[in-house]
Amino acid sequence: MRPRMKYSNSKISPAKFSSTAGEALVPPCKIRRSQQKTKEFCHVYCMRLRSGLTIRKETSYFRKEPTKRYSLKSGTKHEENFSAYPRDSRKRSLLGSIQAFAASVDTLSIQGTSLLTQSPASLSTYNDQSVSFVLENGCYVINVDDSGKDQEQDQVLLRYYESPCPASQSGDGVDGKKLMVNMSPIKDTDIWLHANDKDYSVELQRGDVSPPEQAFFVLHKKSSDFVSFECKNLPGTYIGVKDNQLALVEEKDESCNNIMFKLSKI
């Protein structure tokens, strides 16, 4: 006789079958992402001087908005930052922009002084006489004369530096230091006003690389309209007016009219 084989028929209940089938039919969570938008971030750095001048620097970079995603297991939300640069490099770029701003303020270092800013202006005396620069025989000479209302005034380019001299209480300095200027005719900015300490005159000299110490003058703000220029190399000596000419004047009384000048923007 052949051996009789036994077969087991295991039955699954309809309820259990429907539950297992339901689990198989549940679709997995899909990753959903919100629309990414690129934004531009701009950092503005400002330095306001006591003299009223404002130094402004802007730096900008691009970054994308945070993007949402869903976890496959827990279904919880996560946020990821997508930017133009990784986080570390973004920090480095921001630090670099700050350093670039500091470098822009200290772009030109001349004999231990740092250029802050520069601007053109017309220069006139206390008695409304204009300071002009006339080309004679291939060289510029300085004239001080009366100018008509309709006559165009010459301009000078003033370069502002931080002076090592401590500032007074008159508010003519920045960060506890006085301001110092170097002046050139706007017609030729390679020429500087130069204090000749031998014959106490003011001359125009052309330089090759950087201005000498005789070309720097400490700026004193006398009022809202007038300033005076003290020679850096000759403390107590100012640019003044003598016989309708610019000259060096030793003046103990800083309120003397012949050392006061008016700077006007045209």
Swiss-Prot record:
Q: Where is this site: Cleavage?
A: F101, A102, L108, S109
Q: Where is this region: Interaction with RELA?
A: 66-108
What Pfam families is this protein classified in? IL33_bt (PF15095)
Q: Which GO terms describe its cellular component?
A: chromosome; extracellular space; nucleoplasm; nucleus; transport vesicle
Q: Which residues would be cut away as propeptide?
A: 1-101
Describe what upregulates or represses it: By cold stress, and by infection with the fungus A.alternata and the parasite H.polygyrus.
InterPro entries for this protein: IL-33, IL33_C
Q: Where is this region: Homeodomain-like HTH domain?
A: 1-67
Where's it found, cell-wise? Nucleus; Chromosome; Cytoplasm; Cytoplasmic vesicle, Secretory vesicle
What GO molecular function annotation could you give as one example from this UniProt entry?
interleukin-33 receptor binding
Kindly provide the PTM information from the record.
The full-length protein can be released from cells and is able to signal via the IL1RL1/ST2 receptor. However, proteolytic processing by CELA1, CSTG/cathepsin G and ELANE/neutrophil elastase produces C-terminal peptides that are more active than the unprocessed full-length protein. May also be proteolytically processed by calpains. Proteolytic cleavage mediated by apoptotic caspases including CASP3 and CASP7 results in IL33 inactivation.
Which CDD domains does the protein's record reference? beta-trefoil_IL33
What role does this protein play?
A: Cytokine that binds to and signals through the IL1RL1/ST2 receptor which in turn activates NF-kappa-B and MAPK signaling pathways in target cells. Involved in the maturation of Th2 cells inducing the secretion of T-helper type 2-associated cytokines. Also involved in activation of mast cells, basophils, eosinophils and natural killer cells. Acts as an enhancer of polarization of alternatively activated macrophages. Acts as a chemoattractant for Th2 cells, and may function as an 'alarmin', that amplifies immune responses during tissue injury.
Which family would the database say this protein is a member of? Belongs to the IL-1 family. Highly divergent.
Q: What is known of its domains?
A: The homeodomain-like HTH domain mediates nuclear localization and heterochromatin association.
Q: What's in the misc comment field?
A: Intraperitoneal injections of IL-33 induce the expression of IL-4, IL-5, and IL-13 and lead to severe pathological changes in mucosal organs.
What PANTHER family does the database record attribute to this sequence?
Answer: DVS27 PROTEIN, INTERLEUKIN-33
Q: What is this protein called?
A: Interleukin-33
